[in-house]
Amino acid sequence: MQKYTSEARQLLALAIPVILAQVAQTAMGFVDTVMAGGYSATDMAAVAIGTSIWLPAILFGHGLLLALTPVIAQLNGSGRRERIAHQVRQGFWLAGFVSVLVMIVLWNAGYIIRSMHNIDPALADKAVGYLRALLWGAPGYLFFQVARNQCEGLAKTKPGMVMGFLGLLVNIPVNYIFIYGHFGMPELGGIGCGVATAAVYWVMFIAMLSYIKHARSMRDIRNEKGFGKPDSVVMKRLIQLGLPIALALFFEVTLFAVVALLVSPLGIVDVAGHQIALNFSSLMFVLPMSLAAAVTIRVGYRLGQGSTLDAQTAARTGLGVGICMAVVTAIFTVTLRKHIALLYNDNPEVVALAAQLMLLAAVYQISDSIQVIGSGILRGYKDTRSIFFITFTAYWVLGLPSGYILALTDLVVDRMGPAGFWMGFIIGLTSAAVLMMLRMRYLQRQPSAIILQRAAR
């Protein structure tokens, strides 16, 4: 019991800064929306449309680079710290290549935006302008993620938290300058949010790089030999590990976007109620997602040390802590769901629907916690391909079709509307949780030599 208590303390010490960093990131998006809305409703809508395209594109790159964390954690655990700098250099090369692809996609996103049904031309132009300003921040964001993954792989999650809040503090005044045109800058409205956010990502990257350069604990792994050439072998391995994570993230983000599109014809009340419940459940998701990042670090580190039993302890402890958190947040959601809905909107019909959907959200929080922490465990074991197959099957083969059938058809029961899609979420997330646990159990039953051989690749 003592080993689990000790492991839980170490997991929480890693997870809490990640949670706070995510809060800062969410707050940046909130600030952009509010400040653009203060300029005009059209600018706020433009930022929202632009963000809906930016997120899938940049999260694909973000997911690809998540491969660095378990790689660095295992090198650190095995005492092969001299190899970390080379992995990080290749991470920067990979981030650079992916940045170019992301920038090309975002530059041409106008074709997608202008093809949207009945979109106002002025709104479309502002959304395109916002994305074309924001895309210059894509390299800064992805380079920052490489540096952050280096720190987190070395079990240092506080720097990412500090840089997150630094970014938030810089974002507010820079937004003000470019939205309203102060200090000789042009008045750009919502497009100014894109300029500000792009600048903030570069500030965060430079600040993180400065921290790494001066941190005594990383003195032995600093890059002292220049930037070096791309290493096709290392980059291929990072892509093999990272691509399934990137695709899983992409399919998860697009799933919720597709559901939002399917709900939109059902009416204003249904759309508003769905959006409130989804926004709140996304906030609750920060907790298990951050814990999953910590579990990846701990499992990877223990495997690097050559201890499959300690890796199992880290995995089980992460699941236990995650389930406890999910029970608490589920009780909180059920108890206060109407009060929470009232914080967003005071329309009685919207509040009633949002409260009903939040009840369903409370049901799936435990499954959601298990599946995301399970994903973190599998990342620690470098078993990322299974994450993609499980996520795709659970969300797109089971969750979305069943949600569609329940929400919009009479095949099983009378049409349930938005609640049907949320039942689909429950089916999809529960399926993912079960499959993740089965895969984890299968891996942990392998002989130690095979587990460690996979981890060392």
Swiss-Prot record:
Cysteine pairs bridged by disulfides in the record: none
GO MF entries: antiporter activity; xenobiotic transmembrane transporter activity
Cytoplasmic side: 1-10, 74-92, 148-159, 209-242, 297-313, 371-386, 439-457
Keyword Lipoprotein: no
TM ranges: 11-31, 53-73, 93-113, 127-147, 160-180, 188-208, 243-263, 276-296, 314-334, 350-370, 387-407, 418-438
Keyword Iron-sulfur: no
Cellular component terms per the entry's GO annotation: plasma membrane
Compartments where located: Cell inner membrane
Membrane-side (Extracellular) residue stretches: 32-52, 114-126, 181-187, 264-275, 335-349, 408-417
Membrane topology: Multi-pass membrane protein
Chief localization: membrane
Protein name (record): Multidrug resistance protein MdtK
Species annotation: Salmonella typhi
Gene: mdtK
